[in-house]
Each structure stands twice: as C-alpha cells, then as structure tokens.
C-alpha cells in the first residue's frame, strides 16, 4: 500500500529532554519533503504486530485524514505514540505545542483529538520497553519535589491541567479546519 522511510535526525542544539522541539523539527522536515503520514515514537518501542502502518493509513483515509491513530501499548489510558497525516500540520502548524516540553505531550494529542478524531488500533500492539526517563520532567530538575510525593503529585496535577487547557484551545483549530474543508 505504501512505501515507508524512517528519518533519523540529530540536532545537538536542541536542549536535552525538550522532545517536542525535536518532533516539531522532524515533522516539519518530513512535511516539507512531501510525506503524507508521520509516526512519532520513542526508541524504546517494540512492534508486536504486523500491518499497523497500512491499517493506520487506512483508518486515517476513512476519516478524511483528520485525527490520530496507531497501535495501542501498555498504557491503557492513552496512545503514547502517534500516527497522523499531513493535515495535522495544516491544522496546527507543528506536531506539538511549544509550551509542552516532554511529559504530557502524548496527553495533549489524545486530549485534542478525543473523542471525535481519536482512533486507537486495538488489533495492534507496540510495547513500550523503556525504563526510567533519560531527562528531567518538564526540563525541571526540581519537578519531582526531590522525593516529596506531595510536591510531585501537585506538579503533575498542574502540568496535566495546563495541558488540558491547551488542548481545549487547540480543539477549536480542528473544528475550524474540518468545517472549512467539508
């Protein structure tokens, strides 16, 4: 159904742990090179099923190429790796909002596309075999409260709240685009 190419990009000028900038740079390069679909995943993902790329493309095509899809993994709450079409760039102008540094970037795209444009492929599985993060949450060495669980929980709650607010604002862009291109 499709040709697949993996792009490896290394830019040491991007601060360690600011994953969203890295994904935005890669997404822009692939978009400018006229790729139609994009899969964002970490280097600790192990694909357990075959055919997920074609199924992801078929799913998005059946939904006017608007939305988020991909294999599920060991996080049953959200998709933690994402498959989108070129329309994601046309809608937002980036892969991730620059306000998000690392944690909650996957929460954001689930929040922004849910419920109308989120299509998990439950027949495909891609396990996340990673260990502890190799970066500071939100690029903040003090985010975890130096072991104080109350501070850590409060910081997580605030980060998820700000992510939800951002997603609520960005949802309007999807509807605007969708209505314009009916």
Give the location of each predicted region:
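Intrinsically disordered, low-complexity segments enriched in small/polar residues
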Residues: 15, 40, 65-68, 125, ...
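Active-site-proximal specificity loops/subdomain of glycosyltransferases
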Residues: 1-35
């Amino acid at each position: 159904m499709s040709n697949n190419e993996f792009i490896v990009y290394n830019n040491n000028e991007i601060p360690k742990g600011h994953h969203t900038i890295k994904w935005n740079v890669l997404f822009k390069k692939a978009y400018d090179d006229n790729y139609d679909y994009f899969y964002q995943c970490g280097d600790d993902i192990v694909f357990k099923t075959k055919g997920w790329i074609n199924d992801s493309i078929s799913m998005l095509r059946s939904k006017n190429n608007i939305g988020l899809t991909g294999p599920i993994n060991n996080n049953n709450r959200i998709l933690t790796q994402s498959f989108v079409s070129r329309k994601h760039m046309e809608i937002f102008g980036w892969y991730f909002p620059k306000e998000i540094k690392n944690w909650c970037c996957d929460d954001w795209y689930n929040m922004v596309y849910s419920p109308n444009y989120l299509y998990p492929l439950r027949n495909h599985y891609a396990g996340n075999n990673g260990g502890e993060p190799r970066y500071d949450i939100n690029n903040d060495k003090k985010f975890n409260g130096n072991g104080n669980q109350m501070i850590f929980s409060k910081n997580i709650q605030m980060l998820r709240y700000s992510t939800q607010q951002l997603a609520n604002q960005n949802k309007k862009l999807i509807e605007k685009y969708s209505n314009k291109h009916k």
